[in-house]
Amino acid sequence: MEERSGSFLPELPYTNRGVIRQKEELSALIDWCQITIKEVPLEAVIEDVLRIPMELMTVTGYEKGIAGHEVVAIFDNIKVLKPTGNAQYQGFQILMSGKGCRNYENFLQLNEETWFDFLNRVCQYHINVPRIDLAIDDRKPYLSIPDLIVRTKEGLLSTKLREIDFHDSGELKEEVFQSKGGSLYLGSSASNLRLVFYEKGYEQNKKYGTELDENWNRYELRFRQEMAVSVVQELLRYRDVAGLAMEVLNSKIRFLEKPTGSMTTRKRLYPTYQAWAELMKDIGKVKLTMQPQKKSLQKVWEWLEKYVAPSLKLFAEVGKIEKRDYIGNLVANGEMNITQKQLYDDYIKARRLEERG
């Protein structure tokens, strides 16, 4: 993708675009990593476990976290939390959302490591794994999410997961419904396994105003508690993310075709939906990939370009006529909020991180 003319972002470190298409039709990611480490001091969690230089982390005065935890140290979306209230134990929790995992891949690359190296190191400590997510990005795509939703409604799904939900937004064009971002949820949000199939390209477009990629689906496997612990053990044993994902998917769900020329109602005799069979066949070839990026500052810039730049251009032209620097005055009198100050601090730290590399 060509850079926008005049963009300063190619000169910034640590700001890889989140909209660059991957060459692979299928790729596998670790997309959430939440690990509790007991009886280890904060500095050791940061420098020995995460292997992030202490000076790059912001040690907070305790910020609200999740599930009885407070944030005590942070670098962008990589967070270290301390238990509070009923969750008391001696130790800390590492929390990396999807964005945090992409942030952390910068440090993995800097340390010439992989996710397997990190997980192996973590397992040398007394740990628990509240949650870990695996994600398959499908850019072919093999599946149509709206079609999966229709099949689910029609009962053409065999699954051991009891709770099913779906969301399909769209619009009518010439009396034909066209999807603009469908999602299918199998399993409850509190269960040890939840599968989520959704149109990632539409989600990114709605959230950030990025270029719409209609051919980008994401299939997430969200593991919690005992199953999350087992997943980490299996990842270290076989070092095969896609193989593990395929094994879980094959054991939990199967999308079906209505049999022709048969009156049977026994789903186990229904043939497998061809597109699902093709995905299961090819997903076993996928290797774990890393997509290191720090997208927060990039998103601000994209928002400025799309929504603010036209108005700035207007007042810049008016200023030329009136001999007034409207834009300069705006900048001089503006004040950053807490989030923007954090973005600036992260940017400064990112430059220092780049200098180390």
Please report, for each region that a protein language model flagged, where it lies by residue.
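Structured, helix-rich domain cores that form ligand/interaction pockets
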Residues: M1-K295, W303-G357
